[in-house]
Amino acid sequence: MADVQRDTILVTGGAGYVGSHTVITLLEDGYKVIVVDNFSNGSPESIKRIETVTGSVIPCYNVDLLNKNDILDVFKKHKEISIVIHFAALKAVGESVEKPLLYYRVNVMGTVNLIEAMCENGVTRIIFSSSATVYGDPKYLPMDENHPVGNCTSPYAKSKHFVEEILSDICRIKSEWSVVVLRYFNPVGAHSSGMIGEDPQGIPNNLTPFVSQVAIGKRTELLVFGDDYNTHDGTGVRDYIHITDIAKGHIAAMSKVKDSTGFKVYNLGTGKGSSVLDVITAFEKACGKKINYRVVDRRDGDVAAMCADPKKAETELGWKATYNLDDMCRDLWNWQIKNPNGFKPKNGLKH
C-alpha cells in the first residue's frame, strides 16, 4: 500500500501466539498498534520483546473483554483507532469440551462487548481470527471457503462459528461495516529472531510444542494418537502453516478491510498436508536428535486429514504461504533452545 499515513490498529489478544507475531508484522509495515490483553494465554514479556525486536513503544492495556467499560476506556483514550484485529479468545479444544459455558462467555460475549464498543465509537472495520475447526469433519479435501460450516466438534469451534455469524449479521444491518474473517489451519513455528514464539501454559494443545518439548528434554516421549488412519503413513494429516505467513495474511487482509465493505472469509493454509510422522521427521532434521514417540489409540473427535484450499486468499488478497515444514521446525527449535522455559526466566519464576 502506498499510504504515507498508516492506520492505527487495536489488536485484542496481542500478547498471544498469533497476536504477537501479527503485531510485529504490523509495526514492521508501518502501522501504529495498540494492544489489549488479559494475559490468560499471553505474557506481558512478549510485548516487551516485541518492543525490543521492532524498536517501538506499544501502548498495552490489561483489559478483559468481558468488562465493556474497560474496552470503552481504551477507545476513548485512543480516538485514532480505525481498525480492530480480534485475536482475544480461549483456545484449548479439550478444555472447551469440559467447560463449554466458559468458552461461550469469553469468546462470544467478549466479542459482543467489543462490537458494541466499536459501534459506540464509530469504528466499523474488523479482521477476525477464526479457525478451520468451524468446518467440522471434512466433507471433501482440500477445503475451500464454500465447505459447509457449523457442524463443529467442540465448543471452541462453535464459539468461533457463532462469532462469524454475529459479524455477518452486523454487516447485514450496517452497510458501512467491513469484516474480514481469516480461518487458520495449523499455525507452527516462531519469529526468526527466536525472541517470540508459542509458550503454551501447562500441557500443550498442539502437536509441535509437544515435539519440541520432547526434543529439549522437558517431556520423555510424544504420544501419537493412532497410526491406522487412511493417510499415507497411517497418522493424522494437517495443514501446518508458518506463524509468519499467518501474520502476513493479516497485512494482506488490511487493504480488503479498508477498501471494501461487507463480510468476507478467507482460508489461511498452505494447501499441503503433513502427517504426524512427517512433522517428527522434519523436527528431527531441525534439532539433530531422535524424537522418542509412542503410538497409542486414536482420540475421540480427531479426523484423519484436514487441508486448506488457499486459492481465494491468493487471488483476492495477493497472499500465499512461503515457508515449508522444514522452515517451521527450524524456527520452532530456535525458539525452544533460546527459551526452554518460554517467556519465564531459567528459575521458572515469571518476570
Residue ranges and their predicted role:
Residues C119, E198-I203, G301, K320:
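A general boundary/transition motif marking the beginning of the first structured unit of a protein
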Residues M1-A190, N339:
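N-terminal Rossmann-like NAD(P)+-binding domain of SDR-like oxidoreductases, especially those catalyzing
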Residues G13, Y61, H86, V93, ...:
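Short, flexible active-site loop motifs that bind/organize anionic cofactors or intermediates
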Residues E98, K139-Y140, N146-P148, H161, ...:
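Short capping/connector residues at structural and topological boundaries
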Residues S46, V93, D137-K139, M143-E145, ...:
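Glycine-rich, flexible loop/turn motifs
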Residues L207-H351:
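C-terminal substrate-binding subdomain of Rossmann-fold SDR/epimerase-dehydratase oxidoreductases
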Residues Y104, T153-H161, G197, Q201-N205, ...:
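Short-chain dehydrogenase/reductase
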Residues H191-P204, V211-V214, T220:
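Hydrophobic, Gly/Ser/Ala-rich alpha-helical and linker tracts in large acyl-processing enzymes
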